[in-house]
Amino acid sequence: MARNIVVEEIVRTPVEMQQVELVERKGIGHPDSIADGIAEAVSRALCREYIRRYGVILHHNTDQVEVVGGRAYPRFGGGEVVKPIYILLSGRAVELVDQELFPVHEVAIKAAKNYLKNAIRHLDVENHVIIDSRIGQGSVDLVSVFNKARENPIPLANDTSFGVGYAPLSETERLVLETEKLLNSEKFKKEYPAVGEDIKVMGLRRGNEIDLTIAAAIVDSEVATPKEYLEVKDKIKEAVEELAKEITSRKVNIYVNTADDPERGIYYITVTGTSAEAGDDGSVGRGNRVNGLITPNRHMSMEAAAGKNPVSHVGKIYNILAMLIAEDIAKTLPVEEVYVRILSQIGKPIDQPLVASIQVIPKPGHSVKEFEKDAYSIADEWLANITKVQKMILEDKISVF
């Protein structure tokens, strides 16, 4: 059965040629990214435990996580958290399997704690955080699950929804993405342990000049004085300047912690490395899209991918798939830009979308007719192998924020 794939030329100014471009990334320690990370960690942990016990992923969606900011008194040399961060795990998961209870809450809380321990080094998970699992219950008869799987080897869409992806990344997008990844890399943290994980990078390109505004939480126990704090800021700037030279020949202006006011004793210091300790709240889906960026110059989906089940939830699967299709087309065909939109219809097989729209801006001297069939084939092959996306997610080969 032929798939509903439409390839067409789109008439628009490529992002690199637009006068103004805005790009944002919320780093792994940002409250919104903490919510995304926990939601996804819980989903993946449930998937693995369901498979271990029953040989199949049972229905769940854990994409409702709220991070409620705590209260802290940071000070140079080391402060304290006086009110813990409250994290609410919500959503739905099968808890009753053939009249036997599955430990949803235990699996979820353990996954959340492990994620936080690995993601935010200076956060004391036992004392700085309260994790409350209110994940709703569901029940299932395994025989009916296996029978349904035999009848429908390709999962049926659980919603009418769309996913969006594009490629390639612009220089500004790459710079914003790689800046946060550098500052939160294991190597950089070993060299500069004072740099916390709550790093937000905002990029603005005007013509051929890029402004990068970086908000980086500095850990108070790692800096004894304002002088040491300012030295860390300088190191951040120097590292990003070197990175920028590798990515772009455009002029790049770098600003770090611009709200600081040394004369009034105002510095961006934290006890834990995240602003969640100081009243900043976070929610799933309020941050980065599946490519790790927030890009108002591009098509975007408003779906929160983190925490959704990787079997049939098109809000997750189609956003990832659209990105993968776009990346393959951009790598292999003569296009300036490609945008992919995939729309499901509830109850229909996820490999048969209502439409897969591929919009391209051909490179100068090329036309869509030259590679229309190739673009179609790339999308068709990914859709035919759509269950690969689930495998990539469970093997931690894909991040969704």
Swiss-Prot record:
Keywords noted in UniProt: ATP-binding, Magnesium, Nucleotide-binding, One-carbon metabolism, Transferase
UniProt EC number: 2.5.1.6
Named cofactor requirement(s): Mg(2+)
An annotated Gene Ontology molecular function: methionine adenosyltransferase activity
Pathway assignment: Amino-acid biosynthesis; S-adenosyl-L-methionine biosynthesis; S-adenosyl-L-methionine from L-methionine: step 1/1
Database matches in NCBIfam families: PRK04439.1-3, PRK04439.1-5
Protein name: S-adenosylmethionine synthase
